[in-house]
Amino acid sequence: NIGWHALILATGAQERFLPFPGWTLPHVMGPGGLQLLVRSGWPVAGQRVVVAGTGPLLLDTALYLTRHGARVTDILEQAPRRALWSLAVRLARLAPATVWRALGVPRSRLRRRVRPGCWPVAAHGTDRVESVTVTDGSRTWTRDCDYLACAFGLVPSLQWPLLLGCRIEAEAVWVDAWQRTSLPRVYCAGEATGIAGVDCAVVQGEIAGLAAAGQEKAAERLFGARARQQRLAEALQKTFQLRRELLTLATDETVICRCEDV
């Protein structure tokens, strides 16, 4: 047993998967999952990879895989082009450093590979994925690939908060201004309280740590920084909200739960 005066939960997030025909084929996985495999030494040099879904993680994954020799043929972002341009304008005001980092990506690479307003509708193959069918809502086409890295954003990891009995609201852990949960002396920080990115998670962690140590006045001085990061998170959530078509990709034959084969 480990005794404690205060408990701070920082359980993070996990990738959101939406079922579509062929999504259980080998070599169809989340972008974050494929990155973890590559970090562990999994070879992807020369392999054709389609990265698909929504959110900033797609581009990060594509650049990471490219640096390790993979041939990223497409980056399919389901958000429409106009939403991405609107986000870029807002980021220039809220987080200019983020825009400069994005501008550091070779423009020719972006032009060739990023496809806004597109999403996968089916993966095909026998022993592993061999191709993916893509649509932009009006036409469809097929791309050959060795890997399909696909996830539709992130969702809070709530297993531990649920086991402890923390109050959950809007699919995230409820916290007050000092990151306190509904349970006495239990705090929560980061993506478990809502997807807001690493910078917001760091500030939330500092607030939770100070509050747990009884330094609430010091924690209050970080409220402004947290509010700025949360405004940025709201802009990202609005941009990358899922289109309705993604919820109807599964057919009667599509396996919804691969563990139970349902």
Show the residue positions of the predicted features.
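Short hydrophobic core segments
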Residues: I2-G12, D144-G153
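Flavin (primarily FAD) binding-site architecture
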Residues: T11-W23, L154-G165
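Glycine-rich dinucleotide-binding loop and its adjacent helix/turn
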Residues: A13-V50, T54-T61, E169-W178
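FAD-site-proximal beta/loop scaffold in flavoenzymes
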Residues: M29-V38, V121, R128, Y147-A196
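A Rossmann-like FAD-binding core segment of flavoenzymes
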Residues: T66-Q159, R167-A170
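A conserved FAD-binding loop/helix module that cradles the flavin
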Residues: A189-A225
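Long, charged amphipathic helices and adjacent flexible linkers at domain junctions
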Residues: A218-A250
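C-terminal accessory/binding modules appended to enzymatic or scaffolding proteins
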Residues: E245-V262
